[in-house]
Structure formats: structure tokens, C-alpha cells
UniProtKB/Swiss-Prot annotation:
The gene is cmk. Its EC number is 2.7.4.25. Belongs to the cytidylate kinase family. Type 1 subfamily. The lineage of its organism: Bacteria, Pseudomonadati, Pseudomonadota, Gammaproteobacteria, Enterobacterales. Its main location: cytoplasm. ATP binds at G12, P13, S14, G15, A16, G17, K18, G19, T20. It comes from Pectobacterium carotovorum subsp. carotovorum (strain PC1). This is Cytidylate kinase.
Amino acid sequence: MTVMAPVVTVDGPSGAGKGTLCKALAEALQWNLLDSGAIYRVLALAALHHHVDISSEDALVPLASHLDVRFVAEGGQLKVILEGEDVSHEIRTEAVGNTASQAAAFPRVREALLRRQRAFREAPGLIADGRDMGTVVFPDAPVKIFLDASAEERAQRRMLQLQGKGFNVNFERLLSEIKERDERDRNRPVAPLVPAADALVLDSTEMTIDEVIARALAYAREILA
């Protein structure tokens, strides 16, 4: 019988701190890392690199099925490696974002990427960061964490992040955008953003990131022991 590599899933809304937590867990456990939110952007960039017709589902499916991508947590940073090249910054451009949205609209592309995400499950284990990792992608994961925080706290964190990059931001507008996205994510008909029934729900509103990491790591080690 094949023993599947263990998976720790971390789901939650935008701005809850999933990325930071997952990088820390991957480094602490020395496990593989999957950033599911970046995978559509990686596909979009690969399509642009290979001059694949982004409006053709038939052309995108084989590319999605054989996407050569790795995620590497290094010194608290996430590196996205596409076909051996670091594309961490390139995937964040507006052109790639727009292309990613188009690709995500195709059901067969989503199905191909679902299989591709499951292929990240390799020894010694996988940390999976997303919105439906514990409910759809890895429903049998032994450790499931749902990381949440109030919309106000997430807007505050995002504002500080953007200000740190030199952007002028309006808190009320940010808060409104986050609430709208939450509403959309929680009420969508396919894979809504909800905690898995067996997930540990962590509310990080009043916690420091170090406290979140310590709590999640202790929980994971307890289950995996």
C-alpha cells in the first residue's frame, strides 16, 4: 500500500497571514510548499512565455497539466520558480494578473491545475496555502488550519504593507474591498471559503505573527507525532 505524504493545509481569507505562516511552517518542518493562489499567475506567465493562446481552453489544458513550477521558502521569503527561473516578481504584474483571471474561467483548466496541485504532495510532507486546500484539494490532510482575522485588522495590515511600498491608501476603501471579497468568497457556489469540519480555527486578530506560528507549529507536531 502506498503511504501518502502528510499535508498541513492552511486556508483563510485574504490578509489573514497565511503566506507568512506557511513559509514559517515549511522552513521549520523542512517540507515542500504550495502557494495555490500563485499557481494561476504562474500558468498565465507560462502561457505568455510560450505564446499559448490564452483564450483557448484546449491550448491551456496541456500547459496546466505539465506546469513546471516550484515554491521555495527561503529566509522568510517565497520564491516562485518556473522552468528553473525565479519569477517571483514577474508573476505580480498587472498583465499576468489579467491573464490569470481569463485562464481561471475555464473548468478544464481548473481541473488540470487541481491535479497539478495534488502532485505537490511528496515526501517528507507538504504545506498547502490557499482557500479550499482542506475542503477540496486535500480533504484527507491530517492537519488542517483555518487562519482568520477581522476585516478591520486585515485592512489595517494591508494598508501598512502598501504604505511601506510608498503607496497612498484609503483605509475605508480597503476595508470595503476586503468585505466585498469575503462576501464573494464565502458565498460562491463552488468551493466556498469555509473552514473544514476538522480544522483548527485560529483568529489572528489579537495575536502576533510569532504567536500564530508557535500555536500552528505546536498543533501540527502534536497531530503528526
